[in-house]
């Protein structure tokens, strides 16, 4: 009898975990995001950075916010000269978020770093974010990217 109870409990926990994960991974409603836009959009080019790839000269293992660079989250580095428009990204500060739009797709990213080191770019995506816009990572640069600061706290990810 104890085995049945433990199995039932494990099953219930598994179902709950899957439900929560599915709910969090769903796209955010576009109208809610547009209501939170807290500034004019900046339009320009974007590229990708990953300080752990051999030969990359950009950044280091830690971001400007103090977080370790993680290629698997929805994050980006905003151009240093735009730092104040995006909440003054700095070590230990509360993260800020932005709505990024390009090639017919939208995503909320956490702005946790500054850069890009490449002239002419307004934002550098980490690997996960870049894969949304360029799944093969072959483009290298995406032009016509719109980046809008968001007020408040957000769960980063695609916007539907």
Residue locations for each model-derived region?
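Bacterial N-terminal signal peptides
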Residues: 10-19
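Secreted/periplasmic proteins
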Residues: 23-160
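Bacterial N-terminal signal peptides that target proteins for export
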Residues: 1-10
